[in-house]
A protein has these predicted regions:
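A generic alpha-helix structural signal
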Residues: 7, 55-56, 201, 262
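Small/polar-residue-rich segments within soluble enzyme cores
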Residues: 1-40, 78, 259
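Conserved, well-ordered alpha-helix/loop/beta-strand core segments that scaffold catalytic motifs
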Residues: 25-65, 69
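Beta-lactam-recognizing serine transpeptidase/beta-lactamase-like catalytic domain environment
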Residues: 22-32, 72-123, 128-266
Length: 266
């Protein structure tokens, strides 16, 4: 389980042994072959114990996930999934009732929410959408857009609301990020289209495992035309693209993916 399970072979090393000849009384007569043991390798963690303990105390009694990384090298300084469970009963073999209780707990303590919790990334993706649109030439730093309270999908009567009921007024990309203006990113998503969105947002690690050295990790979903057809047997609609523009709709990600995307941006 966890980090020890991932590095079991490296930590365990190799067991040594001897092949000997014995007499009819079981006494060793001579040594035929000897293979000395090889010690396991040392493992140095990046975790900050005090930071880990502090976050655990803050999250006590809550359902939440927190992961803190060093943006310089991606090292994990703290990782907390709450509520958690006591791993000690698993060492000697946990009883049926105790294990059943953990499985049926509605707070799902056996799930590592950092690597297995799947959530819409929501407005956290707006900086990545902006950078992608800038890089693709869809917008420039000087592009302006009037952020009304709603945005209408061209050619339809379908309206999408902004979180700010009064709207944001005239926006450029910087102000749109600062104010988390939904309508600006509806327009950006519409102009980019789902194919380019999928291509660019994949560069930030969405829809794929992060490579963290833990076995329990979900890849999440960065939706595409092919994904929707394969999973839902339905075509992709423009309205689907608009929701993706603000990190909603079919898009789901883990907290560790979200923090990796941020370190990629930094």
């Amino acid at each position: 389980q966890g980090i020890e399970g991932y590095y079991e072979k490296a930590l365990h090393g190799t067991t040594g042994y001897q092949e000997v000849e014995v007499d009819n009384h079981g006494r060793v007569v001579r040594l035929l072959k000897e293979v000395p043991p090889v010690a396991g390798k040392n493992l140095y963690l990046t975790l900050d114990l005090h930071l880990q303990q502090y976050i655990e105390s803050v999250l006590k009694g809550q359902r939440a996930a927190v992961v803190v990384v060093d943006p310089r090298d991606g090292g994990v300084l703290a990782m907390v999934s709450s509520p958690s469970y006591d791993p000690n009963p698993f060492v000697k073999g946990i009883g049926y009732q105790a294990y059943k209780s953990l499985l049926e707990n509605p707070d799902r303590p056996l799930i590592n929410r950092v690597t297995q919790g799947l959530y819409p990334p929501a407005s956290t993706v707006k900086p990545y959408m902006a950078l992608s649109a800038l890089s693709a030439g869809v917008i420039t730093p000087n592009t302006t857009f009037f952020g009304a309270p709603t945005w209408t999908l061209p050619g339809t009567q379908r309206r999408y609301r902004d979180w700010l009921k009064t709207g944001h007024g005239m926006l450029n990309v910087t102000k749109a990020i600062e104010e988390s203006a939904d309508t600006f990113f509806y327009q950006v998503a519409f102009e980019m289209g789902i194919d380019r969105i999928h291509e660019w947002l994949s560069k930030f690690g969405y829809g794929q495992s992060t490579g963290i050295d833990l076995n329990e990790e979900y890849a999440g979903v960065l939706p595409s035309r092919e994904w929707k057809q394969r999973v839902h047997k339905k075509p992709w609609y423009q309205g689907d693209t608009i929701s993706v523009g603000i990190g909603q709709g079919y898009w789901i990600a883990t907290p560790i993916q979200m923090v990796k995307a941020l370190t990629t941006l930094l």
